Regions:
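Active-site-adjacent alpha-helix immediately C-terminal to a catalytic or transition-state-stabilizing loop
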Residues: 131-179
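Soluble or luminal CAZymes and related metallo-dependent hydrolases
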Residues: 64-68, 122-129
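Short, contiguous, well-ordered secondary-structure segments
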Residues: 35-37, 41, 126-135
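Active-site-proximal alpha-helix that buttresses catalytic centers in soluble enzyme cores
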Residues: 18-109, 114-118, 158-180
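Short hydrophobic "helix-edge" motifs at membrane interfaces and signal-peptide entry regions
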Residues: 3, 28-29, 138-139
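Sec-dependent N-terminal signal peptides
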Residues: 2-11
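All-alpha RGS (Regulator of G-protein Signaling) helical domain and cognate RGS-like helical scaffolds
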Residues: 12, 110-120, 127, 131-134
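Short, intrinsically disordered, charge-balanced linker/junction segments flanking boundaries
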Residues: 11-17
Length: 180
């Protein structure tokens, strides 16, 4: 039984390494969309006193979330993954993820959350604007989109974890996923 477990563990390690190599290879080809759900921010949804201009009224990254963001950035820099742009939701937890992972980013309202009833009416316009932006994007490298669960769920039909990256092509075909 111990021998079998050792073989099983060895297999799992090599599968993980192969998938990491596969992800690096995909990203080095360029022209990929990299959706990132914001890193760990305790709680769920948005507080009632939410103000987009005041981070103290929002969920923010925990210490673990900051480390998770830095690990995402480290993965990109250590593997020399080229990026055209990093776009982020205007929510502080997304901006914090982008800041700790990549340093430079631009905010785009089409990446904002529409989870709470307060923002649900924005959903169709945001998804339309997001798809239009991606359709018009012609970069040679990769496009990073730091956003929320609901946006990724709507566009890719994927249930992402906090700090997970989902790689797709411009037609929103999911090619790979990686947790950090």
């Amino acid at each position: 039984i111990k021998f079998f477990l050792l073989i099983l563990l060895s297999f799992n390690i090599s599968v993980k390494a192969n998938s990491n190599d596969e992800i690096q290879s995909l990203l080095k080809e360029g022209k990929k969309l990299i959706f990132i759900r914001h890193a760990i921010a305790p709680g769920g949804g948005d507080p009632l006193d939410f103000d987009i201009l005041k981070c103290e009224t929002q969920r923010n990254l925990s210490i673990e979330g900051i480390e998770q963001s830095k690990n995402i950035g480290k993965f990109f820099s250590e593997n020399n993954i080229k990026i055209d742009k990093v776009l982020s939701s205007e929510w502080c937890r997304c901006k914090q993820t982008a800041q700790h992972a990549f340093d430079k980013y631009e905010t785009k309202s089409f990446l904002n959350s529409f989870f709470s009833a307060k923002f649900a009416s924005n959903k169709n316009k945001q998804i339309y604007d997001l798809k239009k932006y991606i359709n018009e994007w012609n970069g040679d490298n990769n496009l990073v989109l730091v956003t929320h669960y609901v946006t990724i769920q709507e566009v890719l039909n994927i249930t992402p974890s906090s700090g997970e990256i989902i790689i797709s092509d411009k037609n929103f075909n999911v090619l790979a996923r990686q947790n950090f």
